[in-house]
């Protein structure tokens, strides 16, 4: 459902569904939604877990939007955040069968950065934007995403992504840009 919303918003046009070997494509609850998206021109791919791990390491630029089952999603998220080098630059979405949603920041575990103004707050802020989107607040969500894109374009990123900012500086930059857009409801 979350992937379908992202695709329908026009942000993505390619979806990869990763399933363990014991959950064959024919048993997936995603078959019907995937077929509906394919009918609308969205490129749908299916992958086994081992093939997905290979693609993460060999062809990461070919991956766009990925959905899978627990616990694989958590494993993939941690692995990808470690590969990208970000200390909190991304987030993951978990949705239960009864439609409860949880957004969680992706980052490798690293106690050596505690108290050093080194974590990247972008994933946390993007997860807030996703939460607001899920609560039918698309204008606020879009404003947050736009400010983050502006920050990245202006090279206002944390040291883990090659910038010179700390956690507090990038957070303050994003908040100051958002406060200038306070008329958005």
Model regions and ranges:
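Conserved structured core elements
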Residues: 28, 46-50, 122, 138, ...
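Glycine-rich phosphate/nucleotide-binding loop
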Residues: 57-154
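Buried hydrophobic packing segments
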Residues: 3, 34, 124-132, 174
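Glycine-rich phosphate/pyrophosphate-binding loop and the adjoining helix
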Residues: 1-15, 23, 138, 143, ...
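Hydrophobic alpha-helical scaffolding
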Residues: 23-24, 42, 46, 65, ...
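Glycine-rich phosphate/diphosphate-binding loop of Rossmann-like nucleotide-binding domains
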Residues: 1-48
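A structured beta-alpha segment of the ubiquitous adenosine-cofactor-binding alpha/beta core
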Residues: 43-62
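Short, catalytically relevant binding-site loops at active-site mouths
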Residues: 23, 50-53, 72-74
């Amino acid at each position: 459902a979350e992937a379908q919303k992202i695709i329908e918003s026009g942000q993505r046009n390619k979806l990869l569904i990763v399933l363990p070997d014991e959950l064959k494509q024919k048993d997936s609850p995603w078959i019907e939604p995937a077929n509906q998206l394919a009918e609308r021109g969205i490129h749908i791919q299916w992958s086994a877990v081992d093939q997905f791990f290979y693609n993460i390491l060999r062809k990461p630029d070919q991956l766009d939007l990925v959905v899978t089952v627990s616990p694989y999603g958590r494993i993939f998220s941690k692995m990808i955040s470690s590969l990208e080098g970000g200390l909190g630059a991304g987030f993951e979405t978990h949705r239960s069968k009864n439609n409860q949603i949880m957004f969680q920041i992706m980052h490798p575990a690293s106690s050596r950065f505690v108290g050093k103004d080194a974590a990247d707050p972008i994933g946390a802020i993007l997860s807030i934007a996703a939460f607001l989107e899920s609560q039918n607040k698309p204008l606020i969500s879009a404003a947050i995403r736009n400010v983050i894109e502006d920050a990245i374009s202006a090279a206002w990123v944390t040291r883990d992504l090659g910038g010179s900012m700390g956690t507090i500086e990038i957070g303050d930059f994003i908040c100051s840009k958002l406060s200038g857009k306070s008329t958005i409801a």
